[in-house]
């Protein structure tokens, strides 16, 4: 699959989607995007900047949601224009899809909306590549139905059917907890779509702090190493210069100062993983 001018897949080095969870300020977006651009350029990692203009799924009604669609997209457009970076944001409504598609390069669907057929059809007909997140409640093999819906909708609209990615972000495991079943990364390949691992939301503890979600950011390196060892097309990571002060998902954000060291380790693993054939593809024969 071609994404933002580069090839992605298991025959390519992993690409990275990264940035702050939510648009907090123009300065934070520009500074973080600039730092990430420097890091990924030095390592040769294809990079897409991400941030959300609205966090519609919050633990509490008083939680910070973002600057809103108009202001948020304006800031993301500036990142794209001044830093020359492709940009991704998530959408929650059909109106969001229409407006965001005018600005960003890649759209993303929230995990909780993966079974909403009309929504998936609408985003699939936006004309943009889409990173479709697997719901925390969904079996990995059920993502084939979701991807098939998107492809059918794209075909109806006369659009390419290979513009979709399947993203793993953990599975609910009791109350306020998620686990990552690494088998899911191999199972989701059966969708025929490139598989992306969301390394930061996978360590989230949903609602674990009462009115906010908790997280175990120290487990991001652990799970991201495991995912790269399995073999993925891309990685998704939220990052912040000061996670303790982040206005959303700080407990599971990668400290920006540690991003380069983490990516260096993951690059080395990725090269080993993709050097030879994936034996799981032949064990049944």
UniProtKB/Swiss-Prot annotation:
Keywords: Cytoplasm, Lipopolysaccharide biosynthesis, Transferase. It catalyses: D-arabinose 5-phosphate + phosphoenolpyruvate + H2O = 3-deoxy-alpha-D-manno-2-octulosonate-8-phosphate + phosphate. One of its GO terms (cellular component) is cytoplasm. GO terms for molecular function: 3-deoxy-8-phosphooctulonate synthase activity. Its EC number is 2.5.1.55. It comes from the Bacteria. It holds the Pfam family DAHP_synth_1. InterPro entries: Aldolase_TIM, DAHP1/KDSA, KDO8P_synthase. GO terms for biological process: keto-3-deoxy-D-manno-octulosonic acid biosynthetic process. Pathway: Carbohydrate biosynthesis; 3-deoxy-D-manno-octulosonate biosynthesis; 3-deoxy-D-manno-octulosonate from D-ribulose 5-phosphate: step 2/3; Bacterial outer membrane biogenesis; lipopolysaccharide biosynthesis. It is an enzyme of class 2 (transferase). It is found in: Cytoplasm. Belongs to the KdsA family. This is 2-dehydro-3-deoxyphosphooctonate aldolase. It comes from Variovorax paradoxus (strain S110).
């Amino acid at each position: 699959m071609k994404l933002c001018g580069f090839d992605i897949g298991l025959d390519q080095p992993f690409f990275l989607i990264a940035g702050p969870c939510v648009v907090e300020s123009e300065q934070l977006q520009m500074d973080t995007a600039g730092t990430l651009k420097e890091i990924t350029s030095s390592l040769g990692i294809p990079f897409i900047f991400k941030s959300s203009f609205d966090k519609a799924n919050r633990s509490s009604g008083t939680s910070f949601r973002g600057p809103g669609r108009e202001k948020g997209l304006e800031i993301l457009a500036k990142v794209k224009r001044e830093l020359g970076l492709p940009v991704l944001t998530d959408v929650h409504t059909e109106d969001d899809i229409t407006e965001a598609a005018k600005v960003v390069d890649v759209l993303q669907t929230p995990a909780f909306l993966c079974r909403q057929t009309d929504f998936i059809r609408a985003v699939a007909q936006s004309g943009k590549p889409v990173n479709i997140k697997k719901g925390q409640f969904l079996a990995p093999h059920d993502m084939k139905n979701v991807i098939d819906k998107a492809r059918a909708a794209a075909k109806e609209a006369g659009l390419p059917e290979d513009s979709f990615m399947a993203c793993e972000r953990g599975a609910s495991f009791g109350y306020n907890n998620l686990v990552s079943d690494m088998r899911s990364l191999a199972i989701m390949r059966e969708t025929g779509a490139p598989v992306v691992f969301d390394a930061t939301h996978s360590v989230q503890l949903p609602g674990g702090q009462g009115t906010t979600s908790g997280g175990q950011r120290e487990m991001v390196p652990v799970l991201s190493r495991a995912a790269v060892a399995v073999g993925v097309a891309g990685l998704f990571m939220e990052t912040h210069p000061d996670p303790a002060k982040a206005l959303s998902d700080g407990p599971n954000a990668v400290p920006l100062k540690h991003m380069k060291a983490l990516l260096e380790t993951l690059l080395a693993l990725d090269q080993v993983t993709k050097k030879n054939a994936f034996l799981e593809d032949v064990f049944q024969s």
